[in-house]
Amino acid sequence: MPIRKVLLANPRGFCAGVVRAVEIVERVLKLFPPPIYVYHEIVHNRHVVEDFTKRNVVFVESLEKVPDGAMCVFSAHGVPPQAHQLSKSKGLRVIDATCPLVTKVHLEAIRFTREGYSLVLIGHPGHEEVVGTMGEAPMQLVSSVEEAETLVVPNPEKVVYLTQTTLSLDDTAQIVRALQRRFPKMQAPPTDDVCYATQNRQNAVREIAHKIDLILVIGSGNSSNSQRLREVSTNTGIPAYLVNNETEIMPEWLDGVEVVGITAGASAPEEYVMRVVDHMRSLGATEIEEYAAEEERIHFALPPQLVQLAKSAVSA
């Protein structure tokens, strides 16, 4: 039986932090001569990175590769304090595109350390966001219930946990419960560290799960929030596949499938969602429905240093 219907999860795709980060690079490209350097991928999406690379943006994994005095943008995932110090010593002109919700976690780490807490960070080892947060203060990283159950901290009577912003809500809740059993007096951050966009996209997938036979998650493999969307669907019992675009969809995935769900990670451009929708139409889908689970109206202002650099460029 051919595909009959496509159900689009909404919200999906770009979050406010990604919109802001991409806009920062776009504006820097207009204001300054190439090349423009970006420390780490500006967002974890192959298409976004490839597009900027074609336009003389150079992505680097080490600030040592950035020439002294060059223009450099820090990625949306945040950086440790050492990156700011090295940039200053190299005379770099820096625009920090760190998502404000990641900055919030950094500031929490600094404050709780000053207040004498033992900090526990729930996150994925090696992720740029985790590296940046852990650079702010002494803390211990846990990524599983098993690690939480055996964790030893300097002051078990005064513990607070923080989280990476792009985690699975379900997995995070399980780890938090394990930590609470081990440290009954543990404090939570004032507001949830898992960001609004991560939560909304995961909730939208849960809401459409009973209406679909399979879900396609548009996003890149190194995108934490995209991987979590795939996991959320799988945990509901619905087959889920993570793809960058329509060319990666395997025909055998769609055998016996009538209703296809589609969502996209927070760094995936809508253009590639529509390309997948068009592909589903070519396979027989005649009904395309938007399922709106939550309306998002959040917008983040551009960083003040970008405004100052723009003024300097005009007066030069």
What residue spans do the PLM features occupy?
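The feature marks the mature, well-folded catalytic cores of soluble enzymes
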Residues: 1-264, 270-316
